[in-house]
From Swiss-Prot:
Protein name per its UniProtKB record: U7-lycotoxin-Ls1c
Family: Belongs to the neurotoxin 19 (CSTX) family. 07 (U7-Lctx) subfamily.
Disulfide bond in keyword set: yes
Cited Pfam families: Toxin_35 (PF10530)
Organism: Lycosa singoriensis (Wolf spider)
Compartments it resides in: Secreted
Entry GO MF terms: toxin activity
Length: 76
């Protein structure tokens, strides 16, 4: 009887932990997707980097993307 109760509790704990982890991971923004300037929401090992856009010398706004942490893009 004790073995059945212990097995049931262990199974319940395992299912609960898997569910919590899935909820936490599902809430992040994937690589290459648009993010906001608050630098939050990108999946692990990603950061929200923002770049200002210019057209004919006039600033046209800012675009932010989730990219790998430490990666810098430049115009050649």
């Amino acid at each position: 009887m004790k073995l059945i109760i212990f097995t049931g509790l262990a199974l319940f704990l395992l299912v609960s932990l898997i569910d919590v982890e899935a909820q936490n991971e599902g809430a992040c923004i994937p690589h290459g997707s648009v993010c906001t300037t608050n630098h939050a929401g990108c999946c692990s090992k990603l950061s929200c980097d923002c770049y200002r856009r210019f057209e004919k010398g006039v600033e046209k706004g800012q675009k932010c993307w989730c990219i790998e942490t430490g990666v810098t893009f430049s115009k050649e």
